[in-house]
């Protein structure tokens, strides 16, 4: 915990990021940050399905505004752990991991490799990457997949 706070303070000083108010980083937040790091980016809908979906049946209606997901992502953005980028083909934002979020993951030893987070989405592969993220979410939710190795990890181990 001390290491994490020290890393956050150091990155805030170096990047001049201001944090509105303190908050507790939960295990779900760390998992969410790791997911965004591994998948390069995530949409609000994808984060809802992966981390916040409490519907008893998959056929039940999805909440219209995904309010809880939206609130938590806003907290992580204010803390400087996530940033948003507009996708003009969908008129929706996607979320990317910031350098501060990456430092938090490194300090918690949550990563299999240590490549810097993606700074810009390559829109040539946007649809492909988004669909892979949905496939991963579906496989993990159905418990058919327990450990996911992203393509970036596999390429770094060659």
Residue locations for each model-derived region?
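Sequence-pattern detector for short linear motifs
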Residues: 73-75, 134, 155
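Short gly/ser-rich loop at a beta-strand->alpha-helix junction or flexible surface loop bordering the NTP-binding
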Residues: 131-134, 139
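Active-site metal-binding core of divalent-cation-utilizing nuclease and nuclease-like domains
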Residues: 85, 124, 138-158
